[in-house]
A protein has these predicted regions:
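Histidine/acidic residue-rich metal-binding segments in metalloenzymes
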Residues: 70-174
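Metal-associated gating/positioning segment near the N- to mid-region
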Residues: 1-53, 70
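Active-site mouth loops of central-metabolism enzymes
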Residues: 1-10, 31-33, 57-70, 90-93, ...
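Alpha-helix-loop-beta-strand connector modules within alpha/beta enzyme cores
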Residues: 40-60, 103-120
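Structural detector of well-ordered beta-strand residues that form the stable sheet scaffold
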Residues: 27-28, 59, 116, 171
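Short acidic/polar active-site loop segments enriched in Thr and Asp
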Residues: 24-26, 56, 81-84
C-alpha cells in the first residue's frame, strides 16, 4: 500500500484476511487524496487497489490534502457515490487553512457528510521541531516534546469553533 512516499508490506488481501480471521466483517481505510485530485478520483484510485483482493466488506474515509474551488465542490459527487467520511489535517504543510476548513464543514453538512480532523497547530509544531533540531535533540522523545498538549488543544478549540460557526458535526480523531 502506498503512503507518504513509501510502500507498506501489507495489501488489501492480507489486511482484510486478518480482519476476517478476527471476526471483523467490514473495514474502513483512509484513502489519502493526491494534489489536484477530486474526492471521487481519490475513491476510485484506492478502490481499484481494494476491489480485486478484499476478503471482507470495505469502504474509505477520504484524507483531504487539497481542497479549493472545484475540489471543494467535488465532495458532492463523492457523497453521491456513498463516501460520507472525510479527514482533514490542520497540521503538516498540506494542512487545511481555517477559511477552507469552514467551507468544507458547511459543504459536508449540506451533503450529510462527517468531517474528522487531525488537529494540531502546524506553525507551533514546526517552530518547536526546528528548535529541537537546532539544539541537536533528535531522539524520538523530541518528536513528542515538539507536540505539547497546548498545540493540540488550541487547534481542537479552533476546529470546534469553526464547526459551531458552520453548524456542522465534527469528529476529532485525537
Amino acid at each position: 500500500m502506498p503512503f507518504g512516499g513509501t510502500v507498506s508490506s501489507d495489501d488489501y488481501f492480507a489486511g482484510t484476511r486478518a480482519a476476517a480471521c478476527g471476526g471483523t466483517t467490514t473495514v474502513f481505510d483512509f484513502a489519502l487524496q493526491d494534489f489536484n485530485e477530486t474526492m471521487t478520483d481519490t475513491f476510485n484510485r484506492r478502490n481499484a487497489l481494494a476491489a480485486p483482493d478484499a476478503a471482507v466488506d470495505y469502504s474509505f474515509h477520504i484524507g483531504v490534502k487539497d481542497i479549493h474551488g472545484d475540489l471543494l465542490d467535488s465532495i458532492k459527487d463523492a457523497c453521491d457515490i456513498g463516501v460520507t467520511s472525510y479527514k482533514v489535517f490542520m497540521v503538516y504543510d498540506f494542512g487545511v487553512k481555517d477559511g477552507v476548513f469552514y467551507q468544507l464543514l458547511a459543504k459536508s453538512k449540506e451533503f450529510g457528510a462527517l468531517i474528522a480532523v487531525h488537529a494540531e497547530n502546524n506553525e507551533l509544531v514546526n517552530t518547536l521541531t526546528e528548535k529541537y533540531i537546532s539544539e541537536g535533540k533528535t531522539d524520538a522523545w523530541y518528536h513528542y516534546m515538539s507536540r505539547p498538549e497546548f498545540v493540540e488543544g488550541e487547534a481542537d478549540e479552533r476546529a470546534i469553533n469553526l464547526a459551531k460557526a458552520a453548524n456542522a458535526p465534527l469528529y476529532i480523531v485525537h
